[in-house]
């Protein structure tokens, strides 16, 4: 199978979200693809370095390594440098991908329910998520909730469209 590694900045929320995806992929497509998740709890550039080291030290022959981080309050040059490092270290054998959310993964979660611009403070995301989740009968939002992918999956098309819309108004801006 083709091996993929997802290395996240977060140690709770992001790994829990991606672990649900990992279970689906590894169970459904085990002959074609295998996905591993690592929550590292590090900043942008250091996270890339850890992801690269894990990929090359692993007995798995990773073809794709996904470096996932929030922009938080990191300087834009760190966010852009991580993306550049991914591009510069990609070869015909391994492809590095930088994926970030602005400012945190909870914005991605919110985009499943409506269009939000990133100019609302991240402290407002949790109450809004709880409101939406209660409305659909899924209870309160908690930071390391292990079922978020399953809860959000039916709304994925909405989230993708809202993310594209948000991206389009931010073209050319630093993250």
Feature annotation, model-predicted:
Residues 5-9:
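Short hydrophobic beta-strand that contains or immediately precedes a catalytic carboxylate
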Residues 1-3, 15, 19-38, 45, ...:
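C-terminal accessory helical subdomains adjacent to catalytic cores in phosphodiester-
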């Amino acid at each position: 199978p083709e091996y993929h590694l997802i290395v996240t900045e977060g140690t709770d929320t992001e790994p829990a979200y991606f672990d649900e995806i990992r279970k689906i992929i590894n169970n459904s497509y085990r002959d074609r693809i295998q996905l591993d998740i690592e929550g590292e709890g590090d900043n942008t550039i250091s996270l890339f370095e850890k992801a690269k080291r894990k990929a090359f030290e692993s007995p798995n022959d990773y073809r794709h390594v996904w470096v996932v981080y929030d922009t938080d309050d990191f300087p834009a040059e760190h966010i852009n440098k991580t993306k550049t490092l991914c591009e510069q270290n990609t070869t015909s054998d391994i492809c590095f991908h930088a994926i970030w959310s602005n400012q945190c993964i909870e914005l991605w979660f919110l985009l499943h329910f409506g269009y939000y611009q990133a100019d609302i403070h991240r402290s407002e995301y949790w109450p809004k998520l709880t409101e939406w989740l209660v409305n659909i009968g899924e209870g309160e939002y908690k930071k390391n909730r292990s079922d978020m992918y399953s809860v959000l999956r039916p709304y994925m098309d909405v989230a993708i469209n809202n993310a594209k819309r948000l991206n389009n108004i931010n073209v050319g801006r630093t993250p």
